[in-house]
């Protein structure tokens, strides 16, 4: 689910060549890029929230996608209900809401404009402040009643980054993307000026010039 350009989907297909593997995404542009590389994978354009597979899958796999989808209380049990008996759903999502990099996004949106004024529309600020991924216990409570087993854990990784604005460049492709897309040109520049300065203070370079960036990930493996 959320296959994007299909890199991970092709790895799964190569690992299990006899399986029928379907890559699902809501972006026609992403799927077009995925289809440019021929192979055995089937590609389907659909919304995860309303997706109905042709046949019950043995495995549902999603890597760093479901944090963008609202309504986990409904979607997660719904997905488990699509599995074959004994089927498995494996999910990974970032637990980045409480990290300094993401706290500073919200603070900069709230008061990073001239004279401490907010940036962007109210709707964008609300979306930026929304906590999309809950803590592990909440997902256990949600899934334990609709499955035969739930395995859930967190891992904190440390990225070693290079450059003067290393953390900024890292988050550009993840949590910062909706903000940059939602701001007008002038406000985008104002945001980046303030935000990059705050990031450099929160994540100072080490003695060797590198920057350590810790980030948490939540892993969930559910058996139907």
Describe the role of every protein-language-model region.
Residues 1-51:
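Class I SAM-dependent methyltransferase SAM/SAH-binding core
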Residues 7, 127-224:
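Conserved Class I S-adenosyl-L-methionine
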Residues 18, 40, 86, 147-149:
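A generic structural signal for alpha->beta connector loops
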Residues 49-60:
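A short acidic, Gly/Pro-enriched loop at the edge of an enzyme's catalytic core
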Residues 59-72, 95:
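A short SAM/SAH-binding and catalytic strip from SAM-dependent methyltransferases
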Residues 69-70, 83-85:
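Helix-to-beta-strand junctions that scaffold the AdoMet/dcAdoMet cofactor pocket
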Residues 73, 80, 88-162:
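Conserved catalytic/acceptor-binding region of the Class I
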């Amino acid at each position: 689910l959320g296959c994007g350009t299909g890199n991970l989907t092709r790895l799964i297909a190569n690992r299990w060549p006899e399986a029928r593997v379907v890559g699902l995404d809501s972006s026609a542009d992403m799927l077009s890029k995925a289809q440019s590389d021929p192979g055995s994978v089937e590609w389907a354009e659909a919304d995860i929230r309303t997706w109905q597979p042709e046949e019950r899958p043995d495995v549902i796999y999603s890597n760093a996608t479901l944090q963008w989808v609202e309504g986990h209380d409904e979607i997660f049990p719904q997905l488990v209900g699509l599995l074959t008996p004994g089927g498995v759903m494996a999910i990974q999502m970032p637990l980045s809401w409480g990290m300094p990099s993401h706290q500073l996004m919200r603070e900069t949106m709230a008061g990073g404009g001239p004279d401490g004024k907010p940036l962007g529309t109210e709707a964008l600020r609300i979306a930026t402040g929304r906590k999309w991924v809950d803590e592990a216990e909440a997902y256990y409570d949600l899934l334990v009643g609709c499955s035969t087993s739930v395995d859930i854990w967190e891992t904190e990784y440390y990225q070693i980054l290079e450059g003067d604005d290393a953390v900024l460049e890292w988050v550009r492709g993840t949590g910062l993307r909706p903000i940059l897309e939602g701001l007008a040109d002038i406000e985008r520049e104002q945001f980046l000026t303030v935000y990059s300065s705050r990031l450099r203070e929160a994540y100072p370079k080490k003695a060797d010039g590198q920057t350590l960036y810790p980030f948490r990930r939540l892993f969930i493996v559910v058996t139907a």
